[in-house]
Amino acid sequence: MAQLCVALVAGEASGDILGSGLMRALKARHPDVRFIGVGGPLMEAEGLQSYFPMERLAVMGLVEVLGRLRELLKRRKLLIQTLIEEKPDVFIGIDAPDFTLNIELKLRQAGIKTVHYVSPSVWAWRQKRVLKIREGCDLMLTLLPFEARFYEEQGVPVRFVGHPLADTIPLEADRPAARAALGLGEGPVVALMPGSRGGEVGRLGALFLDAAERLCQQVPGVRFVLPCANATRRAQIEQMLEGRQLPLTLLDGQSHQALAACDAVLIASGTATLEALLYKRPMVVAYRLAPLTFWILKRLVKSPYVSLPNLLAQRELVPELLQDDATSEALANTLAPLVRDGSQQTERFDEIHRTLRRDASNQAAEAVLALLKDR
């Protein structure tokens, strides 16, 4: 079995997790493999020779990107030159599409096989990016089934590999154990998850707390848990709690424990909605953006839904209350019946979980090696 050289580039922590799982699965099938590129500590632990620290690519927000644009473009140009000289058997760009899609295009033009792992949201907005993907990508690996259908329609070779979260989150969470670990009793528990970024928490935090106060009047004995992404978010929430008498427990991280312990969730639109679905917890999804941003996105976004549960179900499975519709009264009134019985949501959640549970890393490794079998 000839040695395989695999180049990978991941730009953030979630990509490092995906990349390390894929590397492990590739080594199990093809032990003589060398890994080069850019990744984090998990990928380096699996044997990646990383050309520079992944943190140099982990930039969020338009202002931050503009501030580092020259460095990012210089690093990408150098990376393309290095990889063309190295001639790996395959290049795998993991998420980070604004950085990796251009690399894939240049390497494919140089005769190197290219794979993109994790689809950008081209099905929702900036759909013309699919033209660049079709030109630069030999294979797209998607985590979600509706993404694969979109690429098939667009003539892009694709494989739906499943979602790693669906592999790691159990089909049935142990609610009593999670409650015991968090010191919660028998009564109804609602998780409040207003997001992990400062702007999100600034727009949704007080709104969620107002809704919780209203919910106390509708659901006797209800308690709340709110997982804080970091110390800064915790301080932000603590400031919002001043003068309130809510039966609320703040958690440091522990979002999965909060989801396992609760009966229902009030949640910001984002990846956390998929986690809530996988824990089979009924939810109400809310989101608020700056008015101008919302106005622009409303005209750009092609999808009728914003939350992953509804995109996966292809219908309004969970209530979405956006912008002016997201009032504390509406949130509490919509959530109260779900605390008592959310089975209409959770039965479909179970079906979706089983669809997504496909052993993603091994599926991805098989797809990559199948692409290379004629090399």
From Swiss-Prot:
Look up the record and name the pathway of this protein: Bacterial outer membrane biogenesis; LPS lipid A biosynthesis
Top-level EC class: transferase
Say yes or no: keyword Protein biosynthesis present.
Answer: no
**Could you cite one Gene Ontology molecular function of this protein?**
lipid-A-disaccharide synthase activity
A Pfam family per the record: LpxB
Enzymatic reactions:
a lipid X + a UDP-2-N,3-O-bis[(3R)-3-hydroxyacyl]-alpha-D-glucosamine = a lipid A disaccharide + UDP + H(+)
EC number assigned by the record: 2.4.1.182
What is known about what this protein does? Condensation of UDP-2,3-diacylglucosamine and 2,3-diacylglucosamine-1-phosphate to form lipid A disaccharide, a precursor of lipid A, a phosphorylated glycolipid that anchors the lipopolysaccharide to the outer membrane of the cell.
The family assignment reads: Belongs to the LpxB family.
What's the protein here called?
A: Lipid-A-disaccharide synthase
Q: Which organism is it from?
A: Pseudomonas putida (strain ATCC 700007 / DSM 6899 / JCM 31910 / BCRC 17059 / LMG 24140 / F1)
Lineage start: Bacteria, Pseudomonadati, Pseudomonadota, Gammaproteobacteria, Pseudomonadales
Q: Which gene encodes it?
A: lpxB
